[in-house]
């Protein structure tokens, strides 16, 4: 196809057509759509796109790929994807500041070969990986400040080590940097590392940074700064005039000792740095402290392994070495052959100065040297290690003798190869044998010269494990502990000595012995606390239950005994009339009831007596007429007892409230003054208890009850009361008067007559009173 006029004009445009072509290109550029809410400035020959504060959540996909400057600041972009900046080969300046970027895809900037400035400050980046900044071979300015970066990979800056001029990593969480990579940035002008957690700067980092004009290490955790020609250059030393250099390291906990003396000798105009340690220089201005106060202390070894370490060949050993000084000493170890030891498959040096030898060999026998060094000097301490070679055990027999118990033993015994003879066995004695220990004795080995130590090896006949014990050559006894009870053991003692012929350690059997530990008797252990507590609870509960049962049994017996008596009394008193007004009477000074005296003939009262017969009890009541004329009242019960303990009689007496006529009425037949019996009347009788043998006397006007001051209460009740429920007051004064009296004229009142009053014995009265 032949080229048209337009294409030929582009290939060789005449001078008169140049303005027209510029306008045409601008029109074509304006034909590319601009993303919404963005500002596109097409000023030839550059294309600038401004999308600041537009609320973008991601990089707009409609961005012109020919853009030269792209600013996406103050948005909400959370991630940078691989396709966001693809094919933007003309992009020179990219600003992504003040977003929420936390992820950057690998190779996201790989097509930005012309990019000179990348601003990713004020985002949420946590780390910088080596594949994230790949392809930025022309980068000059990298701004990563005010993020959350904790780690930077060593290969992260490899793409622009020779081109970068400005590196900003301030306000992050960095504890370390790839100082080796930083030292290769030969065109670096500004290094900003302030407000991080950096506590160490590798020595020689700034040697090649001849173009560095500003180093900001403010507010980190630096204790010291390594000597570097960078700082010397700022003082004007050298053949070339110095480049202006500003170094800021204020806000660091500087340890002002001899290691910072080189920095103190420099001339500085600022006076912002202070010392944190040592204590006598705390909070003092660094540049105002005299040089003679920047001191160091030589190391002093404070703790080391014992003067001699004994270890069996093949076992591990640890050699400790501690040192103090200012600055803190560094510990190194030197092997017996003069080699400087480091970390290897067999040895390891810890940070605290401990040397671990995992597998010892015969070459390790000798003196190890601990060297502690710092800026003020060094200190050494020897540690001797003695490696005991493994004993040369005899080969196992072709046909081992049968064992009484299952198991095997590889100890040389008199009946097996490797043992000397029966005399060797006799030289070894097992004494003080218990269930878990035994004391082994053997004589001195004079025929064997140069004995270095003794080796005791033993095991049980049912155990395949062989136990070794190394003891000094001066010992002739050994106490073996931690044995199992009731088990047979084979034990041999070997002497380790130097064989002059081979110059190697050799062993010789001193003797062997077989023994059986005692059985483990069942120990008598005291009862535990919770067992004693349970026993006490059971015992106390048993006592309480027994007491309750005894109390119940006593109540049942008492109820049965007194319940039968109450029932008999109730049966005998069912026919008695209703009574009231209780009064207590005693026979006063009466001495007994051997013979009951008769009532006087002139008395106006007649006593009623209960006549008992063998067929059925009959009650004969005798009444006497009363002179007083009183109203009719209910019968009254009067209980009395003689002081001499005589029986108490049950009689009927008229109540005080009864009238004269009604009181004269008798229940049963009565005698007239002439002695003749008269028929009974229909008036109800009055029941009372009078003391047997007591003379009849007029009834007192004042009543008394068995309960003392509760007489009125008894007077207000008209229901009958049992005689056993009442109390007896023997101290009533007006009832203890002259009580005897002469015997009545009536002979029927005597004790010898066939008719007898119903009486309560003294024993029954006391039982009833107790209840």
From Swiss-Prot:
Chain positions covered by the region annotation Disordered: 397-422, 654-743
Family matches, as PROSITE patterns: FN3, IG_LIKE, LRR
GO cellular component: cell surface; plasma membrane; postsynaptic density membrane
Post-translational modification: Glycosylated.
Keywords, sorted A to Z: Cell membrane, Disulfide bond, Glycoprotein, Immunoglobulin domain, Leucine-rich repeat, Membrane, Phosphoprotein, Postsynaptic cell membrane, Repeat, Signal, Synapse, Transmembrane, Transmembrane helix
Positions carrying Phosphoserine: 613, 718
InterPro entries: Cys-rich_flank_reg_C (IPR000483), FN3_dom (IPR003961), FN3_sf (IPR036116), Ig-like_dom (IPR007110), Ig-like_dom_sf (IPR036179), Ig-like_fold (IPR013783), Ig_I-set (IPR013098), Ig_sub (IPR003599)
Topological category with respect to the lipid bilayer: Single-pass type I membrane protein
Domain (LRRCT) ranges: 252-298
General function of this protein: Promotes neurite outgrowth in hippocampal neurons. Involved in the regulation and maintenance of excitatory synapses. Induces the clustering of excitatory postsynaptic proteins, including DLG4, DLGAP1, GRIA1 and GRIN1.
The protein's name in its UniProt record: Leucine-rich repeat and fibronectin type III domain-containing protein 1
The organism of origin for this protein: Homo sapiens
Upper classification of the organism: Eukaryota, Metazoa, Chordata, Craniata, Vertebrata
């Amino acid at each position: 196809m032949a080229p048209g006029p337009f294409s030929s004009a582009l290939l060789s445009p005449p001078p008169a057509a140049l303005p027209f072509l510029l306008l045409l290109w601008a029109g074509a550029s304006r034909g590319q759509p601009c993303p919404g809410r963005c500002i596109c400035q097409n000023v030839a020959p550059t294309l600038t796109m401004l999308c600041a504060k537009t609320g973008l959540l991601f990089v707009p996909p409609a961005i012109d790929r020919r853009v030269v400057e792209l600013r996406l600041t103050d948005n909400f972009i959370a991630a940078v994807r691989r396709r966001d900046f693809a094919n933007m080969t003309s992009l020179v300046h990219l600003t992504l500041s003040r977003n929420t970027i936390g992820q950057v895809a690998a190779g996201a900037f790989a097509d930005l070969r012309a990019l000179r400035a990348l601003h990713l400050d004020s985002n949420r980046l946590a780390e910088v990986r080596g594949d994230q900044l790949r392809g930025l071979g022309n980068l000059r300015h990298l701004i990563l400040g005010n993020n959350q970066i904790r780690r930077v990979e060593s290969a992260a800056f490899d793409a622009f080590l020779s081109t970068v001029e400005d590196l900003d990593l301030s306000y992050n969480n960095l504890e370390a940097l790839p100082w080796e990579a930083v030292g290769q940035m030969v065109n670096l002008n500004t290094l900003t590392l302030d407000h991080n957690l950096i506590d160490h700067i590798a020595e020689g980092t700034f040697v090649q940074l001849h173009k560095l004009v500003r180093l900001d290490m403010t507010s980190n955790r630096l204790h010291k700064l390594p000597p570097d020609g960078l700082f010397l250059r700022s003082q004007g030393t050298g053949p070339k005039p110095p480049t202006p250099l500003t170094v800021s390291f204020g806000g660091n906990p500087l340890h002002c000792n001899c290691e910072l003396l080189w920095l103190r000798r420099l001339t500085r105009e600022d006076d912002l740095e202070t010392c944190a340690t040592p204590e006598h220089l705390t909070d003092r201005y660094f540049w105002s402290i005299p040089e003679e106060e920047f001191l160091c202390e030589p190391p002093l070894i404070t703790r080391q392994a014992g003067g001699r370490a004994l270890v069996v060949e093949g076992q591990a050993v640890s050699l400790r070495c501690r040192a103090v000084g200012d600055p803190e000493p560094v510990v190194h170890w030197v092997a017996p052959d003069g080699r400087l030891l480091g970390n290897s498959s067999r040895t390891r040096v810890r940070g605290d100065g401990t040397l671990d030898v995992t597998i010892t060999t015969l070459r390790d026998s000798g003196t190890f040297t601990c060297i502690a060094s710092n800026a003020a000097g060094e200190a050494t301490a020897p540690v001797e290690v003695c490696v005991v070679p493994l004993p040369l055990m005899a080969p196992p027999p072709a046909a081992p003798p049968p064992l009484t118990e299952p198991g095997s033993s590889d100890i040389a015994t008199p009946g097996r190869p490797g043992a000397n003879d029966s005399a060797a066995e006799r030289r070894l004695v097992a004494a003080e044998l218990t269930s878990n220990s035994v004391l082994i004795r053997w004589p001195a080995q004079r025929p064997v010269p140069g004995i270095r130590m003794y080796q005791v090896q033993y095991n049980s006949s049912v155990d395949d494990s062989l136990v070794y014990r190394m003891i000094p050559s001066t010992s002739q006894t050994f106490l073996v502990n931690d044995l199992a009870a009731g088990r047979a053991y084979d034990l041999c003692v070997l002497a380790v000595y130097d064989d002059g012929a081979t110059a190697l350690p050799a062993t010789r059997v001193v003797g062997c012995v077989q023994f059986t530990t005692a059985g483990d008797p069942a120990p008598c252990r005291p009862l535990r606390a919770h067992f004693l507590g349970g026993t006490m609870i059971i015992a106390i509960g048993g006592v309480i239950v027994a007491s309750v049962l005894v109390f119940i049994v006593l109540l049942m017996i008492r109820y049965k005994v007194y319940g039968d008596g109450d029932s008999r009394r109730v049966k005998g008193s069912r026919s008695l009339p209703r009574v009231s007004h209780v009064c207590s009477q005693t026979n006063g000074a009466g001495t007994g009831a051997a013979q009951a005296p008769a009532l006087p003939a002139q008395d106006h009262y007649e006593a009623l007596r209960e006549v008992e017969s063998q067929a059925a009890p009959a009650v004969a009541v005798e009444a006497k007429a009363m002179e007083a004329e009183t109203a009719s009242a209910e019968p009254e019960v009067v209980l009395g007892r003689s002081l001499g303990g005589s029986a108490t009689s049950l009689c009927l007496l008229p109540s005080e409230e009864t009238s004269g006529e009604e009181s004269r009425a008798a229940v049963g037949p009565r005698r007239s003054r002439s002695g003749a019996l008269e028929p009974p009347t229909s008036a109800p009788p009055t029941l009372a208890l009078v003391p047997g043998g007591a003379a009849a006397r007029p009834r007192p006007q004042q009543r008394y009850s068995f309960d003392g001051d509760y007489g009125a209460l008894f007077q207000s009740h008209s229901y009958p009361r049992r005689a056993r429920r009442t109390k007896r007051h023997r101290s009533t004064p007006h009832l203890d008067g002259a009580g005897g009296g002469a015997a009545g004229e009536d002979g029927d009142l005597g004790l010898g007559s066939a008719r007898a009053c119903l009486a309560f014995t003294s024993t029954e009265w006391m039982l009833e009173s107790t209840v």
